[in-house]
Regions:
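Intrinsically disordered, low-complexity serine/threonine-rich segments
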Residues: 5, 9, 18-21
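PLP-dependent amino-acid enzyme catalytic core
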Residues: 15-444
């Protein structure tokens, strides 16, 4: 459900003490990300092997292309965030070996990456999370961090946790680790690009990247440019959190007034300043928006057909392949599946949204005559494949008609047209409310 943030979603950070040094337009020197990304990649090898780059036969056959999935959902913490967290901490400790405490504010993948890094380097981590953080995310962060990490539940909203984290850093001399708006984090994420080229043996024709705060996209694109790789890029944002699109329109990061938090790994209200410095010259046409309900269809397909569990943000790159079908035919395409930290308690919501988007489930209000046999009359016009998924009715003794909320599932979009015709022929008055977002958010 949309909300009004001040800086971003779960894994965002207010633009605190950010002085970009990566782009001339910000009055700074360009970083040689080619060497730094390779150094980051080498450092990561002591922690885990390169994530698989897998040719997907199903998607390749569907689009007449060579579709490769860069499986960042298979890192030790099931997301690419471990790369930036480890590299940033490594760089800090190289310059300040006696730095003992690292802090972040996050209820998502960044927290788990920081927890893993703290345990690896033997440093203390303090992770601030909102009190409302699901128990599953708290427990997973504790597992990755072990005794090295302390979790502090503070505030009902992310911004309150962030403020507490910043206050703690100021008071205790701790080092704050940003989820994306940090050059060392961006260099760490660029290790994804190093691995892609090494594993494929050449640069692919196209790379499709998810975008939230922009750290991954900035790192991968910067490395490809540094090694003169001729690949095209497509950047995918959730429709309800298009922070890169907003920044490109005016040439600078903007804070979105509202963000849909469903794609929690990319629900960012403001793209990182350092990230945008590396992305500010991309064509606006290269940025694609993915509707949240369509992402659910992609998640279910990847789960049911491929056996791959992706979180909403992790499915972004695959989700836009139908939109790119004409552009990728006969080409090699790498889609970065950025994360697989999916809480299966959300599966009913994902299925619900996917069915609605696909036109296989509808909700409507039916005015039902309050007479004996009226319900039986309605049930008689249902088709053999029409399944009642929801039925709510409260009889009004002083009225001739009562309102019924009905949810119907079917296996063909054509079934609803036929059902509505039969309802009209039978004299039933109804209103389709499937596309009413206010009601939909209440029902799901």
């Amino acid at each position: 459900m949309p909300h009004a943030p001040s800086a971003g979603g779960d894994d965002t950070v207010a633009q605190l003490r950010i002085f970009p040094r990566v782009c001339p337009q910000y009055g700074c020197d360009m970083t040689d990300i080619r060497d730094s990304a390779r150094s980051a990649t080498q450092a990561l090898r002591s922690l885990f092997e390169p994530t698989p780059l897998q040719r997907n036969e199903h998607l390749s056959a569907r689009y007449g292309a060579d579709i490769w999935l860069k499986r960042e959902d298979l890192t030790p913490v099931r997301s690419y965030k471990i790369r930036g967290a480890v590299n940033a901490m490594r760089k800090v400790l190289a310059q300040t070996p006696d730095q003992e405490v690292f802090v972040c504010a996050s209820a998502g993948n960044h927290a788990q990456g920081v927890a893993f890094a703290c345990r690896h380097f033997g440093k203390r981590g303090v992770i601030f999370m909102p009190v409302t953080t699901p128990r599953q995310k708290i427990d997973k962060t504790r597992i990755f961090g072990g005794d090295a990490v302390e979790i502090r539940l503070t505030g009902d909203y992310f911004d309150q946790s962030l403020a507490a984290a910043q206050a703690y850093c100021a008071a205790e001399g701790a080092h704050f680790l940003s989820p994306f708006d940090d050059d060392d984090v961006i260099e760490g994420q660029a290790s994804v690009a190093v691995e892609i080229i090494e594993q494929l043996g050449q640069a692919p024709d196209m790379v499709v990247l998810p975008v939230g705060g922009g750290g991954l996209a900035a790192g991968v694109r910067s490395y490809f440019r540094a090694v003169d790789a001729p690949s095209d890029f497509r950047y995918v944002e959730p429709l309800g959190g298009a922070s890169l699109t907003a920044a490109l329109k005016v040439g600078a990061p903007q804070t979105l007034p509202r963000v849909d938090s469903f794609v929690d790994g990319a629900a960012v209200a403001r793209i990182g300043t350092r990230s945008f410095a590396r992305l500010s010259d991309i064509p606006r046409s290269s940025v694609l928006l993915a509707p949240e309900d369509r992402i659910c269809v992609t998640m279910l397909e990847m789960l049911n057909v491929e056996g791959i569990v992706l979180e909403p943000a992790g499915a972004l790159a695959v989700d836009v392949l139908p939109v790119l079908a004409d552009q990728i035919r006969g080409k090699s395409v790498v889609c970065v599946t950025s994360g697989g930290n999916f809480d299966f308690e959300r599966l009913p919501e994902v299925k619900e949204r996917a069915l609605r988007f696909s036109g296989l489930k509808k909700y409507f209000i039916l005015r039902l005559p309050q007479r004996p046999g009226a319900l039986r009359d309605f049930l008689g016009i249902l088709g053999p494949d029409d399944d009642i998924a929801r039925f709510e009715y409260l009889k009004k003794s002083a009225r001739n008609f009562g309102s019924v909320l009905i949810g119907i599932e079917t296996n063909s979009t054509d079934s609803f047209a036929a059902l509505f015709r039969r309802m009209e022929d039978a004299g039933f008055d109804y209103r389709d409310i499937t596309e009413d977002e206010t009601l939909a958010n209440f029902l799901v």
